[in-house]
């Protein structure tokens, strides 16, 4: 793909991977990228390859997103133990599209690399003591795959993840349970493009 000198062909090539692998799950993201993706470039950072996406917004601002290499070594011990229990659509994204896709400057507003997926049982969540309703996830089986950069996570409790069920988790307000993982992720990525 990166031996291709024509930028439009490189862009179309990467978008074809997205369409083939997550065309339903991330349809709004793909639609936005189809209209706004200006360039894709191969990056090598300390021997790790990734793709830098150059996105031009409606107001002319240039944003950079990074898509990690799906062939990267798995570097998250807790997640690796439970990987086969994570919904197949999520595993498919990480295996075939990218090991994370996020706003380059903040490394947020997107799906984080596997090494940065949050294992909820490792963190202190002060919000738990303040919840009005009983906690509906098990911290020992919950992982945050998407970080908003402002205290928001899209998290999956693999004990309750049928049909890509997820929790919209906040560090400072009530969580929202039984949400569709891909609906939230797709919407939040596009919001990140437009902010």
Feature names for model-found ranges:
Residues 1-152:
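A surface-exposed partner-binding patch
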Residues 135-139, 143-195:
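A recognition module on extended beta-rich or small alphabeta surfaces enriched in W/G with H and D/E
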């Amino acid at each position: 793909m990166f031996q291709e000198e024509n930028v439009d062909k490189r862009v179309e090539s990467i978008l074809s991977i997205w369409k083939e692998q997550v065309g339903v799950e991330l349809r709004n993201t793909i639609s936005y990228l189809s209209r706004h993706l200006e360039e894709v470039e191969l990056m090598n950072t300390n021997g790790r390859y990734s793709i830098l996406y150059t996105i031009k917004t409606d107001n002319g601002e240039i944003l950079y997103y990074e898509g990690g290499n799906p062939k990267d070594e798995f570097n998250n011990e807790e997640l690796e133990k439970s990987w086969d229990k994570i919904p197949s659509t999520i595993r498919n994204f990480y295996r075939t599209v990218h090991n994370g896709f996020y706003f380059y400057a903040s490394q947020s507003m997107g799906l984080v690399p596997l090494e940065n997926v949050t294992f909820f049982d490792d963190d202190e969540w002060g919000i738990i003591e303040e919840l009005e309703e009983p906690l509906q996830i098990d911290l020992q089986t919950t992982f945050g795959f998407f970080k908003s950069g402002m205290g928001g996570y899209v998290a999956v409790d693999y004990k309750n993840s049928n049909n890509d069920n997820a929790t919209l988790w906040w560090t400072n307000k009530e969580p929202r349970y039984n949400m569709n993982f891909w609906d939230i992720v797709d919407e939040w990525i596009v919001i990140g493009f437009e902010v």
